[in-house]
């Protein structure tokens, strides 16, 4: 409803009939109450003197009760009246006065546009336009102002679209736009160090524009918008997505009806409490949560659930009235103005825009005052009341004067920047079912003030802007590393003890026969394997990243070389035994330790080739594996993301496959040798049983260890414990199986290993070996074992010699009584000596030699020289040689020969070295002894 036109309007209507004349005073009174400014004064104000020319201002706003926003227009009128009254009292525009003419737009585009054109056509020349509440009506009128050279000042239009100065160059507003809250939000985010946010926007242009502007503001300040969600009717899906993206700080743009739905969804998703912070518009109606209707899709959201989800949210809105106790341009404080406003509105509902309307009237007055000063200073001699809609110059003067506005009003400092009010933004927080002001932002000074002890978070501190992910390196426990290192040191001490034992007793028969040099290599391999445990336990908690990467290569090399050294030496020993005892043709074969070292070196060379190629082509690198987040055991608002260091490369599977294949073939070869030599019954020489046990244990443990280690790669303590125990077990069991039996044997029964030297083979092997028992293999270990057998035979034969000496003395005494037997005994004696010497052939096969000796004695019982039965000899043929001189001559020749003839064949010395007599070796009877036998014995 437009205000009545002033005296400059067209001809008045015809006089009403007499009954209507009675109603005219009542009608005029009503019009004066509805639009007092149209007549140039406010209610209760004295009429200005007739000589005071008016400065007309067009007032456009909704006033009817049928329109929802009509309450805004009606609510600000008392404040407008106060401002006009105070301006007149101060004679700010003397000799002029403000003449505000109100026109009802009814928040309708057509009606609002008609009211504007009616004011232009039928009203006086208006200097400015005051008003603009509904965005649609305001934008239409503001877009056409430039053509009329009119400047518009709004007190309630907050839509961001009106900030476009290219489209609305003559539009100003005393109320901050909806976008004005974005710098305040930015300041709040910086204050609490929130660097990561998410947005939730209702699909309405007003909210979308604010969201878009906020995005630009935050982007320029390097604040991450991790997720942007929008919704039309059901916000639950968007809320769920925000939670899935770990958004803790939510910037919402929606109306109060949707706000209830949003918080119900937040309650269902548990997006409230100490971990979350909601920041939403603060311009909702007071106690809006009591007015909204919760939809059926949130049936479980009861009132207490809604209030629980709302607890702690922060609302952002412009400050309707300054809280500072400072006198304004009117000479009164904002608080004094508020009291006067409340007393003047007398039953009219309050409006949150009343302060901006009050300051707006003062802005118009100050602008016109400045324009008059500009006109007075110019040489045009133009009066301000001479303005018309085609006066572009005066329109520009008024426009420039508006831009220069700067004073302190009841809403704070009134300053325009590109037509936008640089006002004050307040922050309120929902606490215990009520909104409490907790701070304000001054846009002019760009400062944020948080009221002490008013803002309250549900936790002990402000929520984090995201789940704090504490990247925690999973490291090996120091106590575990210490325990396993202690076990490793004990293993190395044991290996050192075995090494000392092996070196000290290297000349002992038992140790010498078991290849002490190869034993040293076995110990060295075990110690290298032990040493790798220390390196496997060093991770990022002990060494730097660069050192760890170096350790990746070093520990791989040490473990690989240690394994090959230990088992390579063990298998080389077994191969020599296999080569000796599987030599079917029994050809002479010499396998020295140097050759075994070459074999072990060849195995190591293969290892080095693989490792060098691995390092050159695809070296091991330090990689960090990130696992899924875990809750903090201490219950803090953080999540722990375990990190684990690994030694990996691009083609890790291929390289491991090559190494495993090579080591597997080596173990299979060892198993084959151990199986082939299983029947060699020389404990000092044959370790096949222990090698088999070692291979079995090592193989099983390695397979189990590798599988469990792979399955526990995300648990470094378990993985290290398994790897270390497998290495300790394999190394310890291998060293113990090789050396403990020797140690026990050497300490308890040193000769046990050299007794019972019968070579036991399979039945087929026995038949073949019996046919080729005359061959000789001059290999050190075989020779050593045979030497032991010969020494045992030597001892037995020495005892036999002693018995023969006694028998010889008895025979000699008897021969002194029976000289005729001398010749026969002499012949028999030489025959017996020849038979005994021929037993040197038994050295080719000890078992065979023993058998020959036994058979020979059984078949020639006379060789036993039993003197108690002289009747078994032929008496008659020898009676002629038993004369005393024959006996004396025979004994002088036979005794040295009888005593020394056995010695060369049993390891003794040549008779020529101890007797001036002719050496028995010079006799033809000694020339049949095989040279190989002599070499074998003397060489040993």
From Swiss-Prot:
The lineage of its organism: Eukaryota, Metazoa, Chordata, Craniata, Vertebrata. Residues 762-789 are annotated as: Disordered. Heterodimer of GABBR1 and GABBR2. Homodimers may form, but are inactive. Interacts (via C-terminus) with ATF4 (via leucine zipper domain). Interacts with KCTD8, KCTD12 and KCTD16; this interaction determines the pharmacology and kinetics of the receptor response, the KCTD proteins markedly accelerating the GABA-B response, although to different extents. It comes from Rattus norvegicus. Belongs to the G-protein coupled receptor 3 family. GABA-B receptor subfamily. Residues 772-786 have a biased composition (Polar residues). Residues 780-818 form a coiled coil. Glycans are attached at residues 89, 297, 388, 403, 452. The keyword Electron transport does not apply. Pfam families: 7tm_3 (PF00003), ANF_receptor (PF01094), GBR2_CC (PF18455). GO terms for biological process: adenylate cyclase-inhibiting G protein-coupled receptor signaling pathway; gamma-aminobutyric acid signaling pathway; neuron-glial cell signaling; synaptic transmission, GABAergic. Residues 41-482, 543-550, 618-653, 712-719 are extracellular. Residues 504-521, 572-596, 675-690, 741-940 are cytoplasmic. This is Gamma-aminobutyric acid type B receptor subunit 2. Highly expressed in areas of the brain including thalamic nuclei, the hippocampus, cerebellar Purkinje cells and the medial habenula, and moderately expressed in the cerebral cortex, certain anterioventral thalamic nuclei, dorsal medial hypothalamic nucleus and suprachiasmatic nuclei. Also weakly expressed in the testis. Residues 1-40 form the signal peptide.
